[in-house]
């Protein structure tokens, strides 16, 4: 027999199909009345409002310009950030100037066009960086196999690849993630980020997932010159990527547990200078536990970098991050710790901590972040309007290779306002 709540959802679904502004107002009034009568909880009402808004938006964006286009969905993200960071270099009074600045972190607008026979395309542009975040064509062959071709991130690193920038709980990604995946500057490895290539994705009902990719070896943005670029001897060998994961629901559907590993082999992308015949291998293992209001996440990175430390010395940079959160109502305290050992290659504060000054080149970097998230509109899964703030502190130490004692520290405040749609 149907419950009252089931009937309510069915009624709201019927109203939703009508898709007019007047009906949307009626929906809101009806939901408010059901909350007052105790038929719906505040959280259930919030979820229903979000679902109705999403479905109404999707129906408005559907078009019949061609009978082969089934749906066109528009999405977007605005992130406005303020940061105040103070850097202190041991043994000198000539410290870098304090960073005290506000800026637009991301301004993204995306379009997904879905066609008949499970073909689709996705374009996501970031006006903040004047570059594409994704641009690819997708074909779903069956519930198990999906093929993507174009421009997107390489499948390496849980925090980097699987957790959207809009869902980061500590505002920015960890120092070790940034050191491993962001562009090679002679210190960072460049073992991730955006690539041109082909991705093959798979999944089965048991929770097992896998993903394989073949891409150009170098990380790139998409500009007008990329459409005619032919490559060079230093980057004409493909890079190979793989990720295998497993996700399981916990008892009584109170949470989930996810674990997996990722791997990347990048020919000619190792060493201090790209294209010199030195190869780079990166990998990670990760776990993500969500139980009720609590979450615990972590990841370990490792690498083999030919001539990564110097012209005569390889390096095996490694590190980890771990983060815990606890959701209470609309608020979510966050604590995260990360550590990076460059193994003689070198790392600066700014290589791992966004917006920080360099502080000099050292061998190891440690970071702590203490903060909180306020989900103003939406919840942890939807986060349409979110305010984040926190205190962070970091320390880089020791001279690479020689191990001579040296140190630089940074600490300060970071906040970000975000709107997703």
Name these PLM-found stretches.
Residues 2, 10-15, 19-79, 88, ...:
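N-terminal periplasmic/intermembrane-space "pro-region" immediately following the signal or transit peptide
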Residues 231-237, 278-280:
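Interfacial loop-to-helix transition and helix-capping segments at the boundaries
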Residues 213-232, 266:
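Active-site-proximal beta-alpha loop/turn segments in soluble metabolic enzymes
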Residues 86, 95-96, 135-140, 168, ...:
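Outer-membrane beta-barrel pore domains
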Residues 61-64, 185-187, 229-231, 274, ...:
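Short, P/G- and charge-enriched loop/turn segments at secondary-structure junctions
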Residues 51-53, 131, 157, 306:
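Short secondary-structure boundary/hinge segments and terminal tails
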Residues 62-220, 236-252, 320-345:
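Outer membrane beta-barrel
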Residues 40, 129, 368:
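Glycine-/small-residue-rich active-site loops that bind phosphorylated ligands and cofactors
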């Amino acid at each position: 027999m149907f419950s009252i709540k089931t009937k309510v959802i069915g009624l709201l679904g019927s109203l939703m199909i009508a898709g007019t502004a007047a009906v949307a107002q009626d929906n809101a009034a009806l939901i408010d009345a059901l909350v007052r009568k105790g038929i719906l909880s505040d959280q259930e009402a919030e979820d229903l409002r979000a679902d109705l808004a999403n479905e109404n938006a999707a129906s408005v964006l559907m078009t019949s310009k061609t009978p082969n286009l089934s749906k066109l969905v528009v999405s977007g993200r605005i992130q406005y950030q303020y940061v105040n960071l103070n850097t202190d270099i041991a043994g000198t009074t000539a410290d870098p100037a304090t960073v005290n600045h506000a800026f637009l972190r991301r301004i993204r607008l995306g379009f997904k066009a879905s066609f008949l026979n499970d073909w689709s395309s996705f374009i996501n542009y970031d006006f903040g960086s004047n570059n594409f975040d994704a641009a690819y064509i997708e074909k779903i062959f069956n519930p198990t196999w999906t093929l993507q071709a174009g421009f997107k991130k390489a499948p390496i690193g849980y925090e980097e690849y699987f957790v959207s920038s809009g869902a980061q709980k500590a505002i920015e990604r960890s120092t070790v993630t940034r050191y491993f995946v962001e562009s090679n500057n002679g210190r960072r490895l460049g073992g991730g980020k955006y690539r041109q290539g082909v991705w093959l994705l798979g999944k089965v009902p048991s929770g097992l997932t896998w993903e394989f990719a073949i891409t150009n070896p170098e990380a790139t943005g998409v500009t007008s010159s990329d459409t005619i670029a032919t490559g060079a001897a230093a980057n004409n060998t493909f890079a190979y990527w793989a990720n295998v994961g497993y996700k399981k629901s916990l008892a009584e559907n109170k949470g989930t547990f996810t674990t997996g590993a990722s791997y990347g082999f990048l020919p000619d992308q190792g060493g201090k200078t790209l294209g010199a015949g030195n190869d780079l291998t990166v990998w990670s293992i990760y776990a993500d536990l969500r139980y009720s209001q609590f979450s615990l996440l972590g990841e370990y990175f490792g690498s083999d970098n030919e001539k990564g430390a110097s012209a005569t010395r390889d390096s095996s940079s490694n590190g980890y991050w771990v983060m815990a959160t606890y959701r209470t109502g609309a608020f979510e305290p966050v604590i995260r710790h990360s550590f990076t050992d460059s193994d003689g290659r070198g790392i600066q504060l700014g290589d791992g901590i966004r917006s920080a000054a360099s502080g000099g080149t050292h061998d190891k970097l440690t970071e702590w972040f203490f903060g909180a998230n306020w989900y103003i509109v939406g919840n942890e899964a939807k986060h349409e309007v979110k305010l984040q703030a926190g205190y962070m502190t970091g320390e880089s130490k020791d001279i690479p290779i020689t191990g001579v004692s040296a140190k630089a520290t940074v600490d300060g405040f970071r906040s970000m306002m975000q709107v997703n749609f």
